[in-house]
Amino acid sequence: VELCGIMLRDSAHIQEFEAEWKNRKGKRAGAEPVEPMYTVQDAEAACRLFRGVEYGKRIELAPGIEARFVDVGHLLGSASIELWITEGSTTTKLVFSGDIGNLEQPIIKDPTYIQQADYVFMESTYGDRNHAPRPDYVAELAKILQRTFDRGGNVVVPSFAVGRTQEMLYFLREIKEKGLVKGHGNFPVYIDSPLATEATRIFRDTDPDCFDAQTRALLEKGIDPINVPGLRISVTSDDSRMINTDRTPKAVSYTHLT
C-alpha cells in the first residue's frame, strides 16, 4: 500500500506537469486547455481508500463475488487477482494480472503460479518470447565498474525507482563485501531520485516475511541487504548538482521520472 501511494502521487505530479506544459504550448496556438488525467489531490483521495490484503487469503467483495491476491514476484507487493463470480449454481473464475516476475530475482519471492481459470486477462508485452538465461549480474556489474573506474569514469545506471534501484543496491553491497572491484573499494554510490529514496525506505521497513529466503537469511544475521557502504542520497536539485563536483569514480543510480 505504501509503495502504491508514493507511485500514484508521483504519477499524478507528472500528469499535472505535462498538462501545464501542453497548456503553455497550446495557448500560443489558440488550442483548448487540457486537464491532467488525475491530480495529486485525486491521488491523495484515492490513497485514503486503500486497504491492504494478505496474499493467499480469499475475501468476499459482495454476495457471490470472492477474490484472492496472489504474489507474482514482479515488484514488492505486486499481485495477480483471482476472482470467483457465482450466479445461481454456476461459479466462474477470472484472473487479472499485470507483469509476472522472473525466477530468482533478488529480494522478492518467486511468482506463485495459478493453476486454473476460466478466463484470464493479463499484460502481455513479452508474451511471445522466452527469457534468456539469467546472467551473473554481480560478476558482470563488477567488471563494468572495474573497467570504468580504472579509466577515471563514472557508472551511471538508469533504474526504475521501485524494484530496479533496490536490486542494484543489493548487487553493489555484495560487490563491496566480496571486494570484487580492486583499487576502488570505497567508491561512493549515489541514489539520485527522491522517489527511489522513499521506495528504498519502504523496502527497509517491510515485514521480512515478504522477502525471499536469501534476503531473510541476511536479515537474520543483522545484514541490511540494500545498505551499501558509501551510499549517498540525493533528494534536492542542489544534491544532484553536487554529484558533478565529486571527481571520485562513482556509481550513480537515477530515474528521470522524479
Label the predicted regions.
Residues 3, 163-164, 184-205:
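Short, conserved secondary-structure transition motifs
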Residues 42, 112, 206, 243-244:
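Structural motif
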Residues 202-223:
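Acidic, Ser/Thr-rich peripheral helices and adjacent loops at domain boundaries
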Residues 217-236:
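Long, charged amphipathic helices and adjacent flexible linkers at domain junctions
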Residues 239-241, 246-250:
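C-terminal or mid-to-C-terminal helical accessory/interaction module adjacent to the motor/catalytic core
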Residues 255-258:
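Conserved small/polar residues in nucleotide/adenosyl-binding loops
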